[in-house]
A protein has these predicted regions:
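A detector for small-residue-rich transmembrane helices and their helix-helix packing motifs
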Residues: 1-227
Length: 227
C-alpha cells in the first residue's frame, strides 16, 4: 500500500534543500557587492524581465535569500514541515510538490505583476505549498513550525489568515505575500492529486474550524457589545 511505502521515506530531499539554501547564502554573504547584485538580478525572479538564468530563474530564485533572518525563518519552517510531509508522501512526490509550488507561485506572480522590476527571492512560495499539504493530508500532525507545538491544520490556517490579511491591507514590507498564497493554492491542488479522500477530509476539518472561529467571534463580539 502507498502509505506503508511512503512512511519509510527519510527526509533526504528536505535536508538537501536546506543544505543548498545555506550554501547559496554563504556565497551571497561572502561575495562582493557587485557580484551579489549581479547574482540577485540574474537568478532572482523579475516579472518584467528574464535574467541571465532565463526560465531557470523560476527555480533558482527559491534558493536565494536576502539576509540571515530571511534564511533562518524559511529554513526553520521547511525543516519542521518538510520532513513530515516528505515522510508521508515520499521523496519524489515531495520534491515535485516543492518545485511545482515555487514555480507556479512565481509564474502567477509574474502574470499579476508584469511591470515589476524588483527581483523576488526566497523559498516561501514553495514552503507554503508544503504547508498546504500538511494542513490537508495531516491536519492533526503536531508541528513546531510556529515554535509552539500545534496541529498542522491550526498552523496552516494561522499562516494563511495572516497572509490573506497582509494582502488585503496591502502591507508594504518588501515581502511578496501574494506568492505565499499562490504557493499554498498549488500545494492544495497537489494534496488532492496525491490523496483526494484524505485531502477532502482535511478540507472539511479546516472549514469546520474556521466556522467555529467565526461563530465564536460573532458571539464574543455580541457579548462585548451587550456588556
Amino acid at each position: 500500500m502507498f502509505m506503508a511505502e511512503s512512511g519509510k521515506s527519510k527526509p533526504t530531499v528536505t535536508n538537501a534543500l536546506i543544505t543548498l539554501c545555506v550554501l547559496m547564502f554563504m556565497v551571497i554573504l561572502f561575495g562582493s557587492k557587485g557580484f551579489v547584485m549581479s547574482l540577485l538580478f540574474d537568478y532572482g525572479l523579475i516579472p518584467s524581465a528574464i535574467g541571465a538564468a532565463g526560465p531557470l530563474s523560476l527555480v533558482t530564485y527559491m534558493f536565494l535569500h536576502a539576509n540571515l533572518a530571511h534564511l533562518v525563518s524559511n529554513l526553520f519552517v521547511l525543516h519542521a514541515v518538510g520532513r513530515e510531509v516528505e515522510r508521508d508522501v515520499g521523496s519524489l512526490r515531495f520534491g515535485l510538490l516543492y518545485l511545482a509550488s515555487g514555480i507556479f507561485a512565481g509564474l502567477i506572480h509574474m502574470a499579476t505583476n508584469p511591470a515589476s522590476d524588483v527581483p523576488v527571492i526566497g523559498a516561501s512560495g514553495a514552503i507554503f505549498g508544503l504547508i498546504a499539504v500538511m494542513l490537508l493530508l495531516m491536519p492533526f500532525k503536531v508541528t513546531t513550525a510556529l515554535f509552539l507545538p500545534l496541529p498542522g491544520v491550526v498552523m496552516g490556517l494561522l499562516l494563511v489568515l495572516i497572509e490573506v490579511a497582509a494582502v488585503i491591507v496591502s502591507v508594504e514590507s518588501g515581502v511578496a505575500h501574494d506568492m505565499h498564497l499562490y504557493g499554498f493554492l498549488i500545494g492544495c491542488i497537489g494534496a488532492f492529486a496525491i490523496d483526494y479522500d484524505r485531502a477532502f477530509r482535511g478540507l472539511v476539518i479546516a472549514l469546520l474550524i474556521l466556522l467555529a472561529l467565526y461563530i465564536w467571534a460573532v458571539y464574543f463580539e455580541g457579548v462585548l457589545m451587550i456588556g
